[in-house]
Amino acid sequence: MILGTGIDLLKISRVKKVHDKYGELFEKKILSEDEIKKKTKISLTANKLAKFFATKEAFVKALGSGFTKNISFKDISLKNKLNGKPYIILSDRVQKYLYKKTPRGYKPIINISISDEKDYVVSNVINSFLKK
């Protein structure tokens, strides 16, 4: 059972322009606390920032909320498994909101696909439910 799908397409140069202008302020707006802590371990290129931004946008679209109901970029952490597959960690508040939308006897599943080609990043998120 599918709750919703979300997709976001972003031109990397737009993110670079904003990041060049606002730097750390921009990072603090779109990155979770965990992502900010780990940024010293990874190189935050415009491409990576665009992937964070697009995936979080796609997730809230799939959730059906957008960035409302007190949901912000900081409530969503993008991570990768050892094999590179992306996944999301949600703040307690967003997790509770997702579980409220989950039918009894089901568990929420978040599927993510991120791709980039030259000047663009695209992220697709499908929020669905699986019977327990």
Locate predicted features.
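Core catalytic alpha/beta fold that binds nucleotide/phospho-ligands
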Residues: 1-132
